[in-house]
Amino acid sequence: METLFCRSSLALQLTIATGNPIKVAEIEAMLGPLPLDVQRQPADLDVEETGSTYRENAELKASAAALRTGCWALADDSGLEVDALQGAPGLYSARYAEGNDAKVQRILKELVGSPYRSACFRSTMVLCDPSGSCRAAAEGICWGELLSAPAYAGGGFESLLWVREARCTYGELNAAQLSRLGSRGKAARALAPQLRELLHLS
């Protein structure tokens, strides 16, 4: 397969399939120092997540961004998986309820009386070439235990998942901890060597 490249100025351009600049900066930092011009996706690009797995959803987003920009594109999809709920909410984490408070309250209600609190955040990250074809994928998992009440107000599932190694909730992890312990950080670090090889980065 022919390898295509997209250049912005003198640097290869990589599109992160999100419109959130904070997430773009977060993923760029997680990938480590790379000679890339990292950009977010076009503002008017809106991809419906119709996949049946995290990977399928990530591929939909990365492929659409790659085809629109003509550049390599990276996307991720993630969710909270609760053992006592047979992996729910999983793929439907973002749509589990309207708003963070409602999501937290629904999870806590469904776990009433259950002694089993183990859960994890799972993320899958994919890389698509400019033709929209998926060329690499990686997964990251952060295990923890769900608290009986959120650690702080206004947070979502991340305010409930206690990460024992960090001695705080997922939502309280700092940037370095997110890269080392977080599910997205683990996926990004696992994908980085493949990205370097595919894009011929030194």
Give residue ranges: language-model regions.
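Anionic-ligand binding patches
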Residues: 2-15, 22-202
